Amino acid sequence: MEIFFHGQSCITFEHNGKKVIVDPFINGNKLSDLDSETVEVDYIVLTHGHGDHLGDTEAIAKRTGAKVIGTPELCDYLAGKGVENTHPMNIGGNVAFDFGKVKYVQAFHSNSITEAGEIIYLGMPCGLVFTLGEKVIYHCGDTGLFSDMKLIAERHPADVCFVPIGDNFTMGIDDAAYAVNELIKPTIAVPIHYNTFPYIEVDVNAFADKVHTKVKILQSGQSVSI
């Protein structure tokens, strides 16, 4: 199957005839190849609620009727915006949907949005483990390095791992490479969350040079096959 990258942390895939998008940051994302007014999906899965991840969720969900999967707080926030089709999950939950299973796992980050000068708490930030038939995708979300990445990988060995490398807000190159080499050990590593803003500009090739497993550097609209 093919998993497509769309800049920052946004990925899409299709399984069992259902289309899934993760963290649909499209408008305002200079690297995105998608159009929020035409993208068609059945599910929107969110790691957390920062603007570069929540992105265009509200507009896409209202237009398409896609089910939004996120933390309870994030689902409640979206319900208040008129998004009716949501499924709340939390860390440790592992639910079978018609496209496959989603498990919410830890990520070490923050999770809020600011509206009219008010900070709104949106629950714990998360990583995601997708089990699609015999294939496993680990999307780390936004996170620093933490040792239980090894436990997540032992429970769910990943065919592909989407790992943030941009530093400043998440792991940088050195920590991300350590996570891949020593903790997660996926078959393929795909760097994400870099070069979208000045704060997170890094040399992606330096990450590839430090990683022992196969690295797939994707431009927006390109895919990795598992």
Curated annotation (Swiss-Prot):
Q: What is this protein called?
A: UPF0173 metal-dependent hydrolase MCCL_1373
Q: What is the source species?
A: Macrococcus caseolyticus (strain JCSC5402)
Record bears the keyword tRNA-binding? no
Record GO terms (molecular function): hydrolase activity
Q: Which UniProt keywords apply?
A: Hydrolase
Kindly give the NCBIfam families that the UniProt entry links to this protein. Answer: PRK00685.1
Cysteines engaged in disulfide bonds, as pairs = none
Q: Which PANTHER family match?
A: UPF0173 METAL-DEPENDENT HYDROLASE MJ1163, UPF0173 METAL-DEPENDENT HYDROLASE MJ1163-RELATED
Q: What highest taxon heads this organism's lineage? A: Bacteria
**Family classification:** Belongs to the UPF0173 family.
